[in-house]
Every structure is written in structure tokens, then in C-alpha cells.
Amino acid sequence: MNTDDVLAVFREAGAILEGHFILTSGLRSPVFLQKARVFMHADKTEKLCKALAEKIRAADLGPIDYVVGPAIGGLIPSYETSRHLGVPSVWVERENGVFRLRRFDVPKGARVVIVEDIVTTGLSIRETIDCMKDLGIEVVAAACIVDRSAGKADVGTRLISLAEYEVPAYPADKLPPELAAIPAVKPGSRNI
């Protein structure tokens, strides 16, 4: 599965939106990938996550003990990808603004892959890595359905992406006039 195939799945689901969006990262963009419209369809989710699992396997990372997903956006893709890898899925969630592994016991030294939905700046993955390091858990790689940065985001580890789709993103004070003229909406989940 390549970038065009992934974007075709997003288009079929009506998940590529155009307008003025405030991304989870705080950056502004004329395009928003509304992955919830994809993930509401089990067949589309399975197709994408099975392909991501195959790409993770092909990366020859050695044994993987767990897949870790940052809540909220990483929950569905991490679970479905773990199913195809045949390993347990756990997740981190925010507690006082910091990712914590609250509901699971993952042993020190466990080897994990972090699976995220969409990467723009890599912040959620970096924060998940910090949480894992604090627990003595080894992050062998991160993976995502779509890398909006096209490989430019520093996620703090190797990033395996099913699709690279570079979409412009701007700080709020550096918007092009055509984007500034459109009212902004914030569809992300960072502060939920």
C-alpha cells in the first residue's frame, strides 16, 4: 500500500477536509485529515492497519512485545495494528497534561512500537517515548498511518509511515492571506 492508496481510503471516507484548521500541534492548515471518518469503518481501518503491520514487520525490528498508542488519536490504529502483529495493545493517556501508562503493567525491558494515527510535529510520539523511558521500556520504533511532515518531523525514534503526505502548516501569526480570510475550526483531540 502506498501513499496514493492510503489517500484513496481517506477520500472514500470523506476524510480529507479543506478549510482553515487548527491542528492538534497548534499549527494552522488548509487541509485536515479527519481520521475518525476512516476509523468509523472497520473494513477501512483493518485495511490500513494490516498494511501498517506488514510495513512494521518488513522493517526487521526484532521481537516486539507490545504496541503502544497515545490516547486519543492512537487508540484505534494501535489496537488494530497490534491485532495484525499478534501482540498486546496498551495505551498512554494524559494525567495532568503528561502521558502515563495507567491501566497496564508492561515489564521493564519490554520492546514496544508506538503506533499513532497522523504525525505532524511528532510531539505525541516524543511524549510517549519519554513515558516509556521513565518505565524502563525500550521503544524500537514508531509508526503512523499518515506522516503529514513527509519525513521532516523529529519523533525521537525511527518512524515507519504508511503514507507521507506533506500538507502546509503555519504558525498562527504567519498565515497566508487566503487562509487568514477563512474562520478557523479546531477538530483535533489534544485537549480532550
From Swiss-Prot:
The keyword Glycosyltransferase applies. Orotate binds at residues 120, 148. It holds the Pfam family Pribosyltran. PROSITE patterns: PUR_PYR_PR_TRANSFER. Transmembrane segments: none annotated. It catalyses: orotidine 5'-phosphate + diphosphate = orotate + 5-phospho-alpha-D-ribose 1-diphosphate. Homodimer. Catalyzes the transfer of a ribosyl phosphate group from 5-phosphoribose 1-diphosphate to orotate, leading to the formation of orotidine monophosphate (OMP). This is Orotate phosphoribosyltransferase. It comes from Brucella abortus (strain 2308).
